[in-house]
Amino acid sequence: MARRFSAPYQSEPVSSLATWSRNLAIFAVVAVVVSILIVRFGFLEMKPALATFFGALGCAVLSILVGLAAFAAIWQNGSRGMGRILLAFLINAILLAYPAYLALQYRKLPPIHDITTDPIDPPRFEALARLRSGEGANSAVYAGLYSAEQQRIAYPDIETVELEVPPQRAYEVTLALVTKRKWLVIDERPPQLPRRIGRIEAVARTPIMGFREDISIRITPDGEESRVDIRSSSRYFESDLGSNAARVAKLIEDINSAVDNAKPAQKKPQAPAKAPAKTVKK
C-alpha cells in the first residue's frame, strides 16, 4: 500500500473507469437540476420532465457500479483514480439520499393523493378544475370512498375546523395564512348573504421539484360561529407521499392558533371585598 503514495505510483495512468464514474456522477447532478427547472418553469410536459429526472437517477446508479468496477481494477493493477471514485460516491450519495427516503415513504404511506377534512362533501375545485387538463393530470372530482377510508386510517386527526368566530372573520384569518404561505390564489370569494359561504382556491408547490398541488377551502356558517373545510390534492401522481396531509394538518393548526391568539384575554372577575369583621365592645 505504501507504493500507492510513492513517486513511481504518481506516474501510473489514471483508471479510465474511475474517470467515467466521476463524469457520470457530475452528469447526473446536471440532469437532475435540469429536470427540476423543467418542472418548475413548465418547459415540457410532466412525462418528459420525469423521464429526465429518473434518467439522471439511473446515471447515478450506473456511476456507482462503474466506481465499484474501477475500485477492483485499481486494487489489482495499482493504477490511480481513487480520489475520483470517492468524489463520485459522495456526489451519488447526496443525489440518491432524498429519492431513497421518498421510496421508503411510498412503502409506508397509503397510495392516495386527495386529502380533505370532509370526505362526505369535500370542497369542490371550480376555478382549479380548468387547470387540470394536462396529460396525466388527476381528475378534479374527489377520489372517492376508498381514498376517504385510507385517509381515516392514516390521518385520523384531519377533521373540520370549528371556530367560535363569524364566517367573515374565519375567512380573513384563513386568507391571511394562505397569502403568508405564498400560495398562488386562483379564486377567492368572501362569505356573502344569504348563504354566507366563503371559498378560497389556491395552488401550492412541493419544496424541491415544484409539483403543483391544488387547495380548495370552504368557510360555512354554523349559527354565529363557523366551520372551515380544506381539501388538498396533487395534480399529478396517484400517491402524494404524505405531502397533502402534512399541508392540511399544518393549516388546521395555524388557523386554530391564529383565532385563539386574536381572542381578547378574559379578565378574571375580582372577588368582592370582604366586609371588616365586627368587633363587640366589652
Predicted regions and their residues:
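Cytosolic juxtamembrane N-terminal segments of multi-pass membrane proteins
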Residues: M1-L17
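Preference for short coil/turn "hinge" residues that link or interrupt alpha-helices
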Residues: Q10-P13, G67, K108, A154
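N-terminal export and membrane-targeting signals
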Residues: V14-W20, R80-L86
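Membrane-embedded alpha-helical segments of integral membrane proteins
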Residues: S16-I74
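Ser/Thr-rich, low-complexity intrinsically disordered terminal regions
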Residues: V39-G42, A72, Q76-S79, R84, ...
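Core hydrophobic alpha-helical transmembrane segments of single-pass membrane proteins
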Residues: L62, A93-I94, A127
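Hydrophobic membrane-insertion alpha-helices, especially the h-region
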Residues: L86-Y101
